[in-house]
Amino acid sequence: MVITLGELIVEFVSNEIDCGLKKITTFSGPFPSGAPAIFINQASKVGAKTKIYGSIGNDIFGESLINRLKNDGVDTTDIQKLEGMSTGTAHVSYFSDKSRVFIFHIEGSAAEQVTLSNLPKEPFMLHISCASVGIDSVRKNLLDLCSYTIRNGGKICCDPNMRKELAGSPEIKKILIKVLNISGTRRTVARRLR
């Protein structure tokens, strides 16, 4: 089994190249998104048994996220649906040179509220999207979850892709280095972060 945790959001993509999110234009979406959700959805599509931990608002965006994950075979039983909070969102615009700019609306949304329950008893692969380390509730649970995974005979893999829009404090950098070193899969990246 492969498990992950982190932000569950929907994404809106500008239909206009080079708008830079600075002017009124049209967008496509909402697309189910968030690095952990994108990863786990793809893992499920290629046949892995998968599960994700995270939170959504009790709204249409959250419903579309859950439906997409469920339809693709992801175990969503431990996704919390939170009353009084909305599902997180992101807006993205692409540029002619293929770069992109993001605006995330995660702070104050359900995407910030990640709790862990019903962890598998059998060994599992824990996938960590480093973009999620910017979220307090993920960061607070992460090292304990890594220890549990290793003690339980599991493995850890990391996506070292960290969005500058989500990285803030030196604490985030320290946790990233620890997680990358624990995983053993991205030691070169961890050395570069120092």
Language-model regions: role of each:
Residues M1-V74:
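Glycine-rich phosphate/adenosyl-contacting loop at the front of the ribokinase-like
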Residues T89-S93:
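Short beta-strand scaffold segments in enzyme catalytic cores
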Residues Y53-I56, I79-L82, S129:
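Structural motif
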Residues G57-N58, E83, R163-K164:
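Conserved beta-strand edge residues that scaffold enzyme active sites
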Residues A37, D59, M85, G108, ...:
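Alpha-helix N-cap/helix-start capping motif
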Residues M1-L5, K70, T76, S99-R194:
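Ribokinase/PfkB-type carbohydrate-kinase core domain
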Residues V46, M85-G88:
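Short, basic and Ser/Thr-rich N-terminal targeting/leader segments
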Residues N67-M85, F95:
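A glycine-rich helix N-cap at a beta->alpha junction
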